[in-house]
Amino acid sequence: MATPMIYDALIIGGGPAGLAASLALARVCRTSMLFDSGEYRNEGAKEMHTFLSRDGIPPHDFRATCLQQLEKYKDYAYVTNTKITDIANTDVAPGLKGFKAVDFTKKEFFGRKLVLATGTEDVLPTHIEGYKENWPVHIYQCPFCDGFERKSYPIGLLTFPNPSYSHLALMLRPLNKDITIYSNGPVPTDEPTQTALKMVLAAGVKLDERPVRRLINNGDGPENGISIEFTSGATVKLGMLYHRPPTRSRAANLILQLGLETNAIGDVITDTMMLKTNVPGCVSAGDTQENMKQASVAAATGTRAAASIVFQLADEDGKKALAEAHL
């Protein structure tokens, strides 16, 4: 039986974080196997934004460009389209601790280190008719990613459940002063939320508390936009609607298997500088651990995760050489 290859790192996730980690490792001749499940948070989005030199690029084209550039490093950067279902921190060779990953076909892969960069997914509400049909073509969650191209049209903010929505409302005002909060019923009466609401109303943001019956996709482009139909009164038409659905990790099962520590919303806890987790040899990058879930930030953390692994590998190799030299 052939001895399985042990990569310097296994990278789970084919988004900006995982791709950046693969590139950085290859640049210093460290081998990696990247697993791309084909699941992406920005699936359905027509363009990526706020990514220097790639502003406006379709996500599919961005990934294709990344993979094309990785071909230069084919002796170091390996990529396979599969989904990892099981992961273990275990011996991968006599006296060598590492990670064993198993994909959905039961194929096994081994690595000295692990980059967990599976990302997150948005949990879309199911109780609002038409929401899914408008996401992410007319409903957005990040003004840095989407909005500039539609700034000439009225803006809506769906719900106002807590004070954090005041920041989003005020961030949107420079795009267009015609912005309305559609709270889908009464705004919560707790003091922090009401104080935040008073602040945005004082800034000129309007409030409509009518219950929403359904959201209507009027067609492509802001000139068609999205309409909100209420249980009573006139329908309104907008160029775009902002809403922040909760997110969940795509790798909840892997996080559980490894015993990784997470915060209250399920993101993996890492140290700020080296992105190390509580499991030695495992680092996390991108939306899996980052509060600011954006492509450019994810790519930056992927590079940092790779550097962290390179430092660890170099240190281990040096200590091994010293021990074997008996100096």
Swiss-Prot record:
Chain positions recorded as FAD binding sites: 14-17, 36-41, 49, 84, 117, 287, 294-295
Keyword tags: Disulfide bond, FAD, Flavoprotein, NADP, Oxidoreductase, Redox-active center
Pathway: Mycotoxin biosynthesis
Disulfide bonds: C142-C145
Cofactor binding note from Swiss-Prot or TrEMBL: Binds 1 FAD per subunit.
Obligatory cofactor(s): FAD
Keyword Oxidoreductase assigned: yes
One GO-annotated biological process of the protein: cellular response to toxic substance
Sections of the chain in a coiled coil: none
GO molecular function terms listed in the Swiss-Prot or TrEMBL record: oxidoreductase activity
Top-level EC class: oxidoreductase
EC number in record: 1.8.1.-
Expression triggers: Expression is regulated by the cluster-specific regulator verZ.
Effects seen without this gene: Completely abolishes the 11'-deoxyverticillin A production.
Subunit text: Homodimer.
Similarity remark: Belongs to the class-II pyridine nucleotide-disulfide oxidoreductase family.
PANTHER family reported for this sequence: THIOREDOXIN REDUCTASE 1-RELATED-RELATED
Function: Thioredoxin reductase; part of the gene cluster that mediates the biosynthesis of 11'-deoxyverticillin A, one of the dimeric epipolythiodioxopiperazines (ETPs) from the verticillin family that act as mycotoxins. 11'-deoxyverticillin A is required for normal conidiation. The nonribosomal peptide synthetase verP is speculated to be responsible for condensation of amino acids to form the carbon skeleton of verticillin, whereas the cluster-specific tailoring enzymes are involved in further modifications leading to the production of 11'-deoxyverticillin A.
The protein's name: Thioredoxin reductase verT
Organism whose genome encodes this protein: Clonostachys rogersoniana
Gene name of the encoded protein: verT
